[in-house]
Curated annotation (Swiss-Prot):
Residues 580-639 form the KH domain. Residues 651-723 form the S1 motif domain. The lineage of its organism: Bacteria, Bacillati, Actinomycetota, Actinomycetes, Acidothermales. Residues 766-776 have a biased composition (Basic and acidic residues). It is an enzyme of class 2 (transferase). It comes from Acidothermus cellulolyticus (strain ATCC 43068 / DSM 8971 / 11B). This is Polyribonucleotide nucleotidyltransferase. PANTHER family: POLYRIBONUCLEOTIDE NUCLEOTIDYLTRANSFERASE, POLYRIBONUCLEOTIDE NUCLEOTIDYLTRANSFERASE 1, MITOCHONDRIAL.
Length: 782
């Protein structure tokens, strides 16, 4: 790039009636000191990617040290961060998931044995509200890596495909995604024969999938999803062509990097000759722990017999042993169609499902598949507990939150316990996406939902086990799911025979089959359609036809799992007595202020008096939640009295609460927002006719008193008189639940009885004009 020439290339994506999208690549203008830098544009979305390699290799590493970081800058969306310091902090969940989207196709594209650190930093500079940046970032990262002169088998093209009105649309806009039944990100590379090999897939149905299906849209079945993989291939080819064009003009020459083999041939040959039969016998043991113990003994045997011969090369001996183990596992599957634990290619491990195993929580379930064990726990709460998102995305809140935990003991190991790692965040997001399409709407079920998946035992596909456990737990919590969802992990073993590559697909893979296989293909769905899908591969691409063939095999397994789950629970259970009961009412928008009151005085008073939690939406929808139905009903009555008031009339009696004391009398709350004055002259009657110097000698804030409306003036001000003067003042714990019109028992102030215990040190009075018990403020008369 002499003289800092700026080079560009464009990929034009033609969606027919859905319009044209143009992805533009540019290099030479920004980040010129990076090993390779590129800017990718889609509409006004602008993403900068810089790829740099370290000068010296990390010889002590036995893996490729690739790091991908995505930096979301909130200025990209014209916003200032909401944190205390008003700057970006730790990456958002969306940024972490985008890191994984980039890493998964990039990592297998580097030459094997590379030990130099490679860092890809993607910075989101501008976000078009209509275009998602994650797929743009995949292409930008591929472009910058291609320009950096690294041993990289790119380019890699990434495209988002949405199934809208029966058509697959590339790079859909946000508004178009609202009409999509399926959303899929596909990354791949072009093979020498011109075909496209799929390297990564991340896909899910949408919140609107089931409503759209009911309106006549085609469901995202296995056949439809397979069609989407094929539809993505020409767009990937176009993106790769644009990157290759730019690289031909601006890429650095490929640098020769030192490559480090895990072992030399002489070590492998010696290991194979020494312990091959021992490894083969160990691999016939079905139990994971017993098999691993046997393999550990084989490793000790190999080190004991070969350690002196290959002194100082112990790491090579162990690496060669792993390679031998991998080879034997794959050979047995390819030739004998028998797996490590003795299963056939499509067999599923034993399944068990239970619900309601944890006391007091709102919902719980235990799902087991072989040695994989997932505990699911559901918590319900008010919508105010939705997660608030501070990202560049237009989404600002999330009602359903799925958190996945993977403690080290789940694999019988010791390790760090703390904040979630990228893998845990990714697994939780996958399970979340699998369940979102079947969740009830906010209107049908006005709750914030937190689902936690505890992977307490792991031997393959804890993420898909989390989907199953979560379905069971949600039903146990009483969540009316539109359909149950189950998931299964598929594997792939490939081998070359007579120059032709053969593929064998495995159902329900073990952890070892994941480690020694070529693919981890996770599929979740209902009985009728796919809700989520994820593909990771160690190869530099898999034919789309192989993936399409794996989908029906996954469906058969999914149906089997759903049958087992249905025996545990098939319908939503009654809600836990410890879960909040939420009722919904609608009030006129112009009454929202009256319900809230000055500085929240009225709504806080209602919440204090009833014990209910209240959330008010901008459209006048009010959600009232309480663990007891009576508290929620009391709050609803109080709100209705304000929003749809029945004006007090002369002669009506109320059981009121003293809310303010003044030199000329006390103000008594009859209804929320409706107070009346009990004049000091009336207090004299309660004091036996003697002069009252201090009104609080007779009544204090918080006291309850039976009063009658004597007069209502032209301004609506109420004058009160005490009823049955000798017993007018009630103790704090007097019954206050009854109400009636004049001539019967008195109405209560707002209907509900206040809670007796409000927490230590908390004043019973609340609001801007009155404080705690015994506190007096004077009010100047005008």
């Amino acid at each position: 790039m002499a003289d800092h020439d700026v080079h560009t290339a464009e990929a034009v994506i033609d969606n027919g009636s859905f319009g044209v999208r143009t992805v533009r690549f540019e290099t030479g203008r920004l980040a010129r000191q990076a090993g390779g830098s590129a800017v990718a544009y889609l509409g006004d979305t602008m993403v900068l990617s810089a790829t740099t390699a370290s000068k010296e290799p990390r010889e002590q590493f036995d893996f490729f040290p690739l790091t991908v970081d995505v930096e979301e800058r909130l200025y990209a969306a014209g916003r200032i961060p909401g944190s205390f310091f008003r700057r970006e902090g730790r990456p958002s969940e969306e940024a972490i998931l985008t890191c994984r989207l980039i890493d998964r196709p990039l990592r297998p594209s580097f030459v094997k044995g590379l030990r130099n650190e490679v860092q890809v930093v993607v910075t989101v500079l501008a976000v078009d509200p209509e275009h998602l940046y994650d797929v743009v970032a995949i292409n930008a990262a591929s472009m910058s890596t291609l320009l950096a002169g690294l041993p990289f088998s790119g380019p890699i093209g990434g495209v988002r495909m949405a199934h809208i009105d029966g058509t697959w649309v590339a790079f859909p806009t946000y508004s178009e995604l609202e009409r999509a039944t399926f959303d899929m990100v596909v990354a791949g590379r072009v093979l020498p024969d011109g075909d496209v090999a799929i390297m990564m897939v991340e896909a899910e149905a949408t919140e609107e999938t089931i409503p759209l299906i009911r309106e006549g849209a085609p469901a995202p079945t296995e056949e439809v999803v397979a069609g989407g993989l094929e539809a993505a291939k020409p767009f990937i080819r176009t993106l790769c062509a644009a990157q290759s064009e730019l690289a031909a003009r601006a890429a650095k020459p490929v640098t020769e990097f030192p490559l480090f083999r895990d072992y030399e041939d002489d070590v492998y040959d010696a290991v194979a000759a020494t312990v091959r039969d021992d490894v083969a016998r160990a691999l016939t043991i079905a139990g994971k722990q017993e098999r691993e113990a046997a393999l550990d003994e084989v490793a000790n045997t190999a080190l004991g017999r070969l350690g002196e011969r290959f002194a100082g090369r112990e790491k090579e001996i162990l690496a060669a042993l792993r390679a031998l183990t991998k080879k034997l596992v794959r050979e047995r599957i390819i030739r004998e169609k028998v797996r490590i634990d003795g299963r056939g290619l499509t067999d599923i491990r034993p399944l068990t499902a239970e619900v309601g195993i944890v006391p007091r929580v709102h919902g719980s379930a235990l799902f087991e598949r072989g040695e994989t064990q997932i505990l699911g726990v559901t918590t319900l709460n008010m919508l105010r507990m939705e997660q608030q998102l501070d990202t560049v995305s237009p989404r600002t809140k999330k009602r359903y939150m799925h958190h996945y935990n993977f403690p080290p003991y789940s694999t019988g190991e010791v390790g760090r316990v703390g904040s979630p790692k990228r893998r845990e965040i990714g697994h939780g997001a996958l399970a979340e996406r699998a369940l979102i399409p079947v969740l009830p709407s906010r209107e049908e079920f006005p709750y914030a939902i937190r689902q936690v998946s505890e992977a307490i035992g792991s031997n393959g596909s804890t993420s898909m086990g989390s989907v199953c456990a979560s379905t069971l737990s949600l039903l146990n919590a009483g969540v009316p799911l539109r359909a149950p969802v189950a998931g299964i992990a598929m594997g792939l073993i490939s081998d070359t025979v007579d120059g032709e590559t053969h593929y064998v697909t495995l159902t329900d893979i073990l952890g070892a089959e994941d480690a020694y296989g070529d693919m981890d293909f996770k599929v979740a769905g209902t009985r009728d359609f796919v809700t989520a899908l994820q593909l990771d591969t160690k190869l530099d691409g898999i034919p789309a036809s192989v993936l399409a063939a794996a989908l029906p095999q996954a469906r058969e397994a999914r149906l089997t799992i759903l049958d087992v789950m249905a025996k545990a629970i098939s319908e939503p259970a009654p809600m836990s007595p410890y879960a909040p009961r939420i009722i919904t009412i609608k009030i006129p928008v112009d009454q929202i202020g009256a319900v809230i009151g000055p500085k929240g005085k009225i709504i806080n008073q209602i919440q204090d008096d009833t014990g209910a939690e209240i959330t008010i939406e901008d459209d006048g929808t009010i959600y009232i939640g309480a663990t007891e139905g009576t508290a929620a009903e009391a709050a609803r009555a109080a709100i209705s009295a304000i929003a749809n008031p029945q004006l007090p009339e002369v002669g009506e009696r109320y059981l009121g609460t003293v809310v303010k004391a003044t030199p000329f009398g006390v103000f008594v709350s009859l209804l929320p927002g409706k107070d009346g004055l009990l004049h000091i002259s009336e207090l004299r009657k309660m004091a036996g006719g003697r002069r009252v110097e201090n009104v609080e000698d007779v009544l204090k804030v918080g006291d309850k008193i039976q009063v009658e409306i004597r007069d209502i003036d032209a301004r609506g001000k109420l004058s009160l008189v005490p009823v049955d003067v000798p017993g007018a003042v009630l103790a704090e714990d007097a019954g206050a639940g009854e109400s009636a019109a004049s001539g019967g028992a008195p109405r209560s102030a707002g209907g509900p009885q206040p809670r007796e215990h409000q927490g230590p040190g908390r004043p019973r009075g609340r609001g801007g004009d009155h404080g705690g018990e015994g506190r007096q403020r004077t009010r100047r008369r005008h």
